[in-house]
């Protein structure tokens, strides 16, 4: 198989390219944008500000991928333990909240503790039909309703009752009863996070990890696929060009990919249209001081707070900002299926700044030296109750017509950057095995 086409130049696309290179094949990669990176793109702005397309760090336990990425930045990376915190009704709560209840209203803490005891004493496992059931069964009603169910509406743009549980993995910590009580009675608790440590490039943002991969493929930017003739094996692009292929691997989001394919049947088109994904407006701010939030990520639960999550790029690498400055990257979530975007990205900037001041993150005396808003049409897969059967039908069709798929939006999975890279490798191996 000589002519391998890879659609997309993010982590998954370069995973596929790396596997092709290892197999002795030089692939051709196509991307609709004028830069590489996909959802892991980085942007360097005048004045010394660097922002990624969302808060990306490398925390893989896969030593092979870890070594590969480290080599790509010549060992020049920051290594740190993650810090996360939560904001709820004026309270700053160490993450995860379930073992850091100290200082919250006594009546609330009492109810949560009693229900955690009930959960621990339970002898029968309750039926779990959806994510809400799982939360109530795991943490009791009060904690579930106060924290994760509220965050779900802000982050996933729909209710926990409308989500399945396929995506949870290690994301929500299920503590021992002793941990819950200790965190309620004492102001200090053990650091608990599903990420034990992360790496981030010294310079160039997260996308610096990808730059050396450019030499292993022929990369054609500004090539947006609009049609795939899988019978003749030809890709057609918006710019009027076309390209034949012997095999193709795509990281294009499934709802975008399926309508491009000649002869896609109605049931598959309908299934692809049912797949839900959040979109996000990211507001990036540069501030004239660095002591903003002592955390890499902060989760905001209150629905009247405009945004959902805030990260601090200057704590990932000090080279992301000019000397003496700090930066905030603020995520505001929408989805076409559940919460349609109702404003221009730039219209989010002032509400974000206002609520950062209301929460105490920004002071009235702070100078905002840089401000920028971008709309990202695909953010996180929403695992609603239609997802599993719809994704299975779409993947079956792609297998039938010989189009490989990979990454978060090809596998339609809640996977991280290293998992996306491996997904691309696996898709390429599958393609070669079937040739």
PLM feature spans:
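N-terminal Rossmann-like FAD-binding beta1-loop-alpha1 element of flavoenzymes
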Residues: 2-29
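Conserved flavin/dinucleotide-binding core of flavoenzymes
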Residues: 42, 96-97, 312-435
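Conserved Rossmann-like nucleotide-cofactor binding loop
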Residues: 12, 35, 255
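Active-site/ligand-binding neighborhood in enzyme catalytic cores
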Residues: 108-233, 241-247, 251
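Dinucleotide-binding Rossmann-like beta1-alpha1 core, especially the glycine-rich loop
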Residues: 47-123
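General small-molecule cofactor/ligand-binding pocket signal
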Residues: 78, 218-222, 369-372, 404
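Mid-domain catalytic core of redox enzymes
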Residues: 23, 224-329, 333-342, 346-347, ...
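Glycine-rich FAD pyrophosphate-binding loop
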Residues: 21-45
């Amino acid at each position: 198989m000589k002519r391998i086409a890879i659609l997309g130049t993010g982590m998954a696309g370069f995973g596929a390219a790396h596997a092709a290179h290892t197999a002795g094949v030089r692939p051709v990669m196509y991307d609709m944008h004028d830069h590489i990176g996909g959802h892991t793109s980085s942007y360097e702005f005048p004045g010394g500000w660097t922002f990624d397309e969302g808060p990306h760090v490398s925390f893989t336990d896969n030593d092979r991928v870890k070594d590969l990425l480290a080599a790509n930045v010549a060992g020049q990376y920051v290594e740190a333990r993650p810090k996360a915190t939560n904001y709820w009704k004026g309270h700053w709560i160490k993450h995860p909240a379930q073992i850091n209840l100290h200082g919250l209203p006594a009546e609330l803490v009492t109810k949560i503790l009693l229900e955690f005891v009930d959960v621990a004493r339970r002898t029968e496992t309750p039926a779990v039909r959806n994510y809400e059931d799982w939360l109530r069964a795991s943490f009791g009603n009060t904690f579930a309703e106060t924290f994760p169910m509220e965050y779900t509406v802000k982050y996933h743009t729909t209710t926990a009752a409308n989500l399945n549980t396929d995506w949870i993995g290690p994301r929500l910590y299920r503590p021992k009863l002793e941990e819950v009580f200790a965190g309620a009675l004492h102001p200090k608790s053990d650091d608990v996070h599903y990420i034990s440590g992360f790496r981030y490039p010294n310079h160039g943002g997260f996308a610096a990890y990808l730059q050396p991969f450019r030499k292993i493929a022929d990369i054609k930017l500004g090539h947006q696929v609009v049609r795939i003739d899988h019978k003749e094996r030809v890709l057609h692009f918006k710019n009027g060009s076309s390209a034949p292929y012997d095999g193709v691997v795509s990281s294009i989001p499934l709802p975008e990919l399926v309508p491009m394919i000649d002869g896609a049947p109605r049931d598959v088109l309908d299934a692809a249209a049912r797949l839900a994904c959040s979109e996000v407006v990211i507001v990036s701010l540069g501030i004239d001081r660095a002591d903003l939030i002592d955390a890499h990520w902060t989760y905001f639960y209150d629905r009247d707070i405009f945004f959902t999550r805030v990260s601090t790029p200057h704590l990932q690498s000090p080279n992301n900002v000019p000397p003496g400055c700090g930066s905030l990257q603020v995520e505001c979530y929408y989805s076409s299926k559940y919460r349609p975007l109702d404003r221009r990205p730039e219209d989010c900037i002032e509400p974000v700044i206002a609520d950062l001041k209301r929460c105490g993150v920004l002071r009235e005396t702070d100078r905002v030296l840089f401000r920028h808003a971008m709309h990202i049409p695909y953010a996180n897969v929403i695992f609603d109750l239609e997802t599993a059967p719809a994704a299975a039908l779409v993947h079956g069709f792609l297998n039938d017509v010989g189009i490989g798929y990979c990454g978060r939006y090809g596998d339609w999975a809640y996977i991280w950057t290293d998992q996306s890279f491996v997904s691309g490798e696996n898709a390429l191996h599958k393609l070669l095995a079937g040739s």
